[in-house]
Amino acid sequence: NFILLDGDMYLIDWEYSGMESKFFDFGDLCLQQNIEENERKELFSALELEEGGDDQVLWNLYRYLSSLTWGLWATRKGVLDKETDKDYLNLGKTKIKYVYEAVNTENFEKQLSLKY
């Protein structure tokens, strides 16, 4: 995946090329950078996203999907890569556990209830 800009060529990752939902990118950013709730609210405001509405539901959904994606990737990588298997397996376990614990909370269904 390449971008040509002012005569220069840049190699980019596909998931960060803007082809995915902005909510996946935003959810992944918050997850990977451990964004606190107050910081997330500031970002929502700056990005003109709807707090407490469908925008927040989509953010929640993609945050969990991002964690599951990374968890499955790391687990697979840990099984296949014998040199670093423990690190990747631990990362996979952490990411999948995050989703598992979220699914088992009382408000999980409410977090994913679209209003439209």
Residue ranges and their predicted role:
Residues 1-24:
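Active-site acidic catalytic loop and adjacent metal/ATP-binding pocket
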Residues 72-116:
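ATP/Mg2+ or Mg2+-diphosphate-binding catalytic cores
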Residues 55-58:
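Membrane-interfacial loop-to-transmembrane-helix junctions in polytopic alpha-helical membrane proteins
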Residues 22-52, 64-82, 98:
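Active-site activation/catalytic loop segments of kinase-like enzymes and analogous catalytic loops
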Residues 61:
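ATP-dependent phospho-/nucleotidyl transfer catalytic cores
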